[in-house]
From Swiss-Prot:
BP-aspect Gene Ontology terms: cellular response to pH; insulin secretion; monocyte differentiation; negative regulation of monocyte differentiation; osteoclast development; positive regulation of insulin secretion; positive regulation of insulin secretion involved in cellular response to glucose stimulus; positive regulation of osteoclast development
Entries under Pfam families matching the protein: 7tm_1
Extracellular compartment segments: 1-12, 85-89, 161-176, 255-260
Gene: Gpr68
SS bond partners: 13-258, 94-172
Lipid bilayer topology: Multi-pass membrane protein
Annotated stretches, region: Extracellular loop 2 (ECL2): 161-176
The organism's taxonomic lineage, starting at the top: Eukaryota, Metazoa, Chordata, Craniata, Vertebrata
Keywords for the protein's UniProt record, in alphabetical order: Cell membrane, Disulfide bond, G-protein coupled receptor, Glycoprotein, Membrane, Receptor, Transducer, Transmembrane, Transmembrane helix, Tumor suppressor
Swiss-Prot/TrEMBL site (Required for activation) positions: 149
Protein name: G-protein coupled receptor 68
Function statement: Proton-sensing G-protein coupled receptor activated by extracellular pH, which is required to monitor pH changes and generate adaptive reactions. The receptor is almost silent at pH 7.8 but fully activated at pH 6.8. Ligand binding causes a conformation change that triggers signaling via guanine nucleotide-binding proteins (G proteins) and modulates the activity of downstream effectors, such as phospholipase C. GPR68 is mainly coupled to G(q) G proteins and mediates production of diacylglycerol (DAG) and inositol 1,4,5-trisphosphate (IP3).
Tissue: Expressed in the lung, testis, heart, brain, spleen, thymus, brown fat, small intestine, colon, peripheral blood leukocytes, macrophages, stomach, ovary and white fat but not in the liver, kidney, and skeletal muscle. Expression in the prostate is weak but detectable. Specifically expressed in endothelial cells of small-diameter resistance arteries.
Subcellular location: Cell membrane
Activity regulation behaviour: Activated by a network of residues that connects an extracellular-facing cavity to Glu-149, a conserved charged residue buried in the transmembrane core of the receptor. Protonation likely drives conformational changes in extracellular loop 2 (ECL2), which stabilizes movement of transmembrane 3 (TM3) and a series of rearrangements that connect the extracellular-facing cavity to Glu-149, a residue only conserved in proton-sensing G-protein coupled receptors.
Length: 365
């Protein structure tokens, strides 16, 4: 890349984007292909939790919606890196896509923190704090999280994010070295958006493990399963978010010149790409490991098999010679529709409650 002109001055800071332009398309395509269908299913399972009056579903749905917003911005970022970091859309679209890219991190962290606290209260204090474990309380907390991040987004809308370099490339959300106005918002992001929530999350999961170890009614295999789930959740959370925030803090503290910006560019953008995998990890950890979700998937699979079976039967009957006898005495869709509806109905018959009670797998995630 060439020299980048910032809001305040022209800075000669040519940075080689080759590694970033090679890795980013691979990551973005992977997250698009895997993350979009996974999060669509996750949204459906979260809806089932809400339908069962389980407050966990509110947090899961909001977490999934945030991930889907981010995934919807990936085609624009994919086009951007494939055009050698040249933003071909308007300034406002750059700001919106940048906000979706960065604010998704803190919206996700916020809801992951809420899920961990909710599961801690369910496991360690199942007969207390009911006022905090209701749909109304979950909706109120969700509104606060979205409002906090929307207010933060306004801060970026007041600054120019599309900058033209000496090669007439319009770079988006890239300032090298980091600007003064970015330092304060980065400190806020690190302390309030990451450090405080991760402390709450770690404390909650530690409390869950303590409560599970003290439980005499839980089998050892079940305890081991819970411990593995908690450990994997924490490890994936730290792997996705810790490197980026450490480097964000390093940039904010010490990036004063172009040489430092060039030296940290590749590792910083690699850490930013790691945050993208959170969109894939969320539905896996918080939905697809759930026992209730396994049952829902089995019902969904059964419904799909019912559709395919009826479709194959219909095609086979259509292949009969003219005048051939038919077992049902009916033909076409009229003979198949009742059978299909019956199979779909039986496949989706659910227990009276899909909620998660006590230390179940999804309850701990």
């Amino acid at each position: 890349m060439g020299n980048i002109t910032t809001e305040n001055s022209s800075l000669s800071c040519p940075i080689d984007h080759t590694i970033h332009q090679t890795l980013a398309p691979v990551v973005y395509v992977t997250v698009l292909v895997v993350g979009f269908p996974a999060n669509c299913l996750s949204l459906y399972f979260g809806y089932l939790q809400i339908k069962a009056r389980n407050e966990l579903g509110v947090y899961l749905c909001n977490l999934t919606i945030a991930d889907l917003f981010y995934i919807c911005s990936l085609p624009f970022w994919l086009q951007y890196v494939l055009q050698h970091d040249d933003w071909s859309h308007g300034d406002l679209s750059c700001q919106v896509c940048g906000i979706l890219l960065y604010e998704n991190i803190y919206i996700s962290v916020g809801f992951l923190c809420c899920i961990s606290i909710d599961r801690y209260l369910a496991v360690a204090h199942p007969f207390r704090f009911h006022q905090f474990r209701t749909l109304k309380a979950a909706v109120g907390v969700s509104v606060l999280i979205w409002a906090k991040e929307l207010l933060t987004s306004i801060y970026f809308l007041n600054h120019k994010e599309v900058i033209e370099d000496e090669d007439q490339h319009r770079v988006c959300f890239e300032h090298y070295p980091i600007q003064a106005w970015q330092r304060s918002i980065n400190y806020y992001r690190f302390l309030v958006g990451f450090l405080f929530p991760i402390c709450l999350l770690l404390a909650s999961y530690q409390g869950i493990l303590r409560a599970v170890r003290r439980s005499h009614g839980t089998q050892k295999s079940r305890k081991d399963q819970i411990q593995r789930l908690v450990l994997s959740t924490v490890v994936i959370f730290l792997a996705c978010f810790l490197p980026y925030h450490v480097l964000l803090l390093v940039r904010s503290l010490w990036e004063r010149n172009c040489e430092f910006a060039k030296s940290i560019f590749n590792v910083y953008h690699f850490s930013l790409l790691l945050t993208s995998f959170n969109c894939v990890a969320d539905p896996v950890l918080y939905c697809f490991v759930s026992e209730t979700t396994h049952r829902d998937l089995a019902r969904l699979r059964g419904a799909c098999l019912a559709v395919l079976t009826c479709s194959r039967t219909s095609r086979a009957r259509e292949a009969y010679p003219l005048g051939a006898p038919e077992a049902s005495g009916k033909s076409g869709a009229q003979g198949e529709e009742p059978e299909l509806l019956t199979k779909l109905h039986s496949a989706f018959q659910t227990p009276s409650s899909l909620g998660v009670g006590g230390p179940s797998t999804v309850g701990l995630a």
